[in-house]
Amino acid sequence: MLKAIILAAGKGTRMKSDKPKVVHEVLGKPMVYYSIEAAKNAGCEKVCVIVGYKAEEVEHSIHATYESLGLADEMNNRVSYALQKEQLGTGHAVKCASDFIGNDGDVVVLCGDTPLVTADTLESAIRRHKTDGNGVTVISAMLDDPFGYGRIIRDDKGLDRIVEQKDATEEEQAVCEVNSGMYIFQCDALLSALSQVKNDNAQGEYYLPDTIGIILSLIHISEPTRHLRI
C-alpha cells in the first residue's frame, strides 16, 4: 500500500500569525488541503497528517473544507492524525506516526505548506522510486538563492547527504541544489533509520533528512529527482 504523511505540526513563525501556517488559505482552502489532495491523486490510499501547534484548529480546518465539498465521509476514511506534542524536528514528527507507517509498502512524506505541489510531480517521483527499487527517493530543486534550504551534498558516487542551512559549512552553503522536503521511503527502511537519528546539531532537533545518509549506508538510493519546492 502507498501511504502519505503530511507534516503540519509547526507554528510557522515567519507568517507572523497566531494561526497555524498550514491553515492559511490559498484560493479559499487551507494550504494543507492541497498537499492532501496531491497525495491522494498520486495514488496514496491513506494519509496521516502530523499535527502539533493548535492541533484541533488544523483538524477542524481540514474537516470543514472536505465537509463543504460534500466529501466528509471520504476524508474520514482516508485521513487520520498523529500528534507531535513537542516540536522536536521533522524526524521526530514522522516518528510520531510510526504505527501508521508500518513495515510494508512505501510512504510519501510532504510538507503541509506546499499548495502548488502536483500529483504529476509526485507520480513521477513514485515511479522512479519503484522502478529503481530505492530505499528512499528525494525530490530536489536548483535555486539561484538557496538560503534557508537544506543542501543536497554529492560526492563522486552521487548523493552523499543533506545538510541543513544552520549546520552547513561555507562551502556547503554555496551549493544551489536544495532539498524540497518531499520524499518517498520504503516503510521498513524509514522506521529503521528514524531509530538511529540523533539531535546533535545546531537546532538540537531530530532532522528527517538525516535518515537519508543512514539509508544510503544500507541500501540503494537514486539520484535526487529535481523539483522546485513552493
Locations of regions flagged by a protein language model:
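Conserved N-terminal catalytic core of the sugar/cofactor nucleotidyltransferase
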Residues: 30-110, 116-121, 127, 131
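A short, conserved alpha-helix in the catalytic core of glycosyltransferases
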Residues: 204-217
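Structural beta-sheet core signal
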Residues: 4-6, 49, 109, 136-139
